[in-house]
């Protein structure tokens, strides 16, 4: 873990287990974490500068989760680059008959694919981002959405399963009455 001025909330934690190391989790400058970062089998987690991870949110990686700069992840969001379980009924049954520490319970036995979330995105409360998804810069994922497919930059994604409901949000006018905003954008 690297970076300056990062902050961990009260119930937050970083879990580095099953073949992963501290080098697999990279936290950039000015990051606030109030949820959990979980890495197994060298699963990479990269948080860009000024990223926020909300209360009870979980980033679970066995491959790669990259969250670019200035992205906000609201409370109770799950971002998992794996299924957390195998699909095979017989293997799932076997897992249930083993101890919690048995090797069969590791995420590497489930399907997995990398996740990338671009710059300046907002991931709404209770959303879920599934394996293999890429979300472009400046996107909003609505609360309670389940994202199973990638989305281009500058759009709003909503629903279960999530779909693009608005595009070109980079063309939406910002409020000019916000104190300090006009100085900020110059």
Q: Which functions belong to the PLM regions below?
A:
Residues 131, 149:
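Conserved coupling/switch loop of ABC ATPases
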Residues 1-87, 96-102, 108-120, 127-129, ...:
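Domain-scale signature associated with acetyltransferase and cell-envelope carbohydrate enzymes
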Residues 136, 140-146:
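A generic "structured core" feature
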């Amino acid at each position: 873990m690297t970076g300056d001025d990062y902050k961990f909330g009260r119930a937050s934690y970083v879990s580095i287990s099953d073949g992963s190391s501290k080098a697999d989790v990279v936290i950039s400058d000015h990051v606030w974490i109030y949820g959990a970062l979980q890495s197994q089998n060298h699963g990479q987690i990269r948080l860009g500068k000024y990223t926020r991870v909300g209360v009870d949110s979980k980033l679970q990686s066995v491959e790669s989760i990259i969250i670019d700069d200035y992205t906000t992840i609201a409370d109770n969001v799950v971002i998992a680059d794996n299924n957390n379980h195998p699909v095979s009924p017989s293997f799932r049954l076997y897992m249930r008959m083993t101890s919690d520490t048995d090797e069969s319970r590791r995420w590497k036995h489930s399907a997995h694919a990398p996740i990338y979330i671009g710059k300046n995105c907002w991931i709404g409360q209770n959303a879920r981002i599934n394996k293999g998804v890429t979300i472009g810069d400046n996107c909003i994922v609505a609360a309670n959405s389940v994202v199973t497919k990638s989305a281009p930059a500058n759009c709003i994604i909503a629903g279960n399963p999530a779909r693009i409901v608005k595009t070109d949000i980079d063309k939406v006018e910002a409020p000019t009455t916000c104190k300090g905003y006009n100085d900020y954008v110059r």
